[in-house]
Amino acid sequence: MKITWLGHSAFRIETGKAKILLDPFLNHNASFAGQDINDVSSGITHILLTHGHGDHVGDTVALAKETGAVVLANADLAAWLGSKGVDRIEMGNTGGTITLGGFSATFTNALHSSAQITEDGVSHALGNANGLMLHFDDEASIFAMGDTDIFSDMGLINELHQPDIGFVPVGDRFTMGGAVAALACQRYFSFKTAIPCHFGTFPIIDQTADKFIDGMEGSKTQVKALKPAESLSI
């Protein structure tokens, strides 16, 4: 398995059976600058979305049309994507699991909102915000928390799924900050590896993952604070 952080909450995940983009906010992502969208979307089989905000949906519509990738999203967001011409969609909702050729995705809770803002400035709700629990055939498992605060049922998610790797939002203001994210990882999860995300993209969120790294000091979990475009092989 090869995991590449594309900046913000966008990741490319490559396994022997799937090539996945998670929350592909690319073209307007300052952390993505200097990377080639054609390279990172090459050969993708699936696009996975945690929720409907623009900094997570990002370039999904264009990429889905260009590549023919299957898009996974909650039911309300899936309906919106369909209205934009995306025709290969797998929809689900909190608690549901979908098998997708080489891996499965389970929608979990996340404490956040989910919406798109139209040109008139009105926010239109698009279902629940979710985390995504990804189980791969003969590979490490990943829990992409999505945008969230800490909540005690994270412990139940860990009990049910025992994820090996966590994608953890740490930027504060719109998600939990680094210190709280470290508490969440140490109290509720038994990750082998934690990868911080959702930081450094906008001036009003934390610019580094330092608070998370400091909070994880002494933990059995290995923290991998990747740079944009940096990859980790598992």
UniProtKB/Swiss-Prot annotation:
Family annotation (HAMAP family): UPF0173 (MF_00457)
InterPro entries: Metallo-B-lactamas, RibonucZ/Hydroxyglut_hydro, UPF0173, UPF0173_UPF0282_UlaG_hydrolase
Family according to the record: Belongs to the UPF0173 family.
Protein name, as recorded: UPF0173 metal-dependent hydrolase RHECIAT_CH0001941
Keyword tRNA-binding: no
GO molecular function: hydrolase activity
Entry superkingdom: Bacteria
Alphabetical keyword list: Hydrolase
Organism (species): Rhizobium etli (strain CIAT 652)
Pfam families associated with the record: Lactamase_B_2
